[in-house]
Amino acid sequence: TATTEIYTLSLHDALPICAMEKQSKKDLNIMYKRILVPTDGTPMSEKAVEGAARFAKSLGASLVLITVVEPYSYTNLSEYRPESIEQYDERVTAEAKDRLADAKRRCDEIGVPSTTLMVKSFSPAEAIIEQSKKHDCDVVFMASHGRQGFAAVLLGSETQKVLTHSQIPVMVYR
């Protein structure tokens, strides 16, 4: 039977935990070369980006920073919309680019190579999982909750979905 060991990762002022089959740090260095890190601009996801960057630096890994923006919703068309589709797209794209630029800057300051992705999807969890496969990521490193905050007691709903459906390890930053 495989044994499981809990690794505590000292990443500055927080204590994220990862459960996995027993591995040595050398094995972790081999296992994790590309880490997908979702960010939605919330303080928790910003801390997760910094934690992921410190973790990646200790392993010599790189980060793939992703933000998922919701496409314009055509539901409730009778509802008053203060902005056009084009205005909405421009606004959410600008916000996403700013969010990714901030995350990349933090990675650069820590000295970790990173690339950025902006994806449009009504399902952030599905987009995260799809992009982790597309970019050959070894692990997803994400905040325990984001914009939904208290939608779930312990974990955000998107984090729960990624944990449930991802075929690669998921590290949850708390």
Regions found by a protein language model. Name each.
Residues 118-127:
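Charged docking surfaces used in two-component/phosphorelay signaling
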Residues 84-98:
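A short acidic, glycine-rich active-site loop
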Residues 131-137:
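Glycine-rich phosphate-binding loop signature in dinucleotide/nucleotide-binding domains
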Residues 168-173:
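Short, flexible loop segments at boundaries between secondary-structure elements
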Residues 139-164:
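Glycine-rich, Arg-bearing micro-motifs that act as flexible, cationic patches
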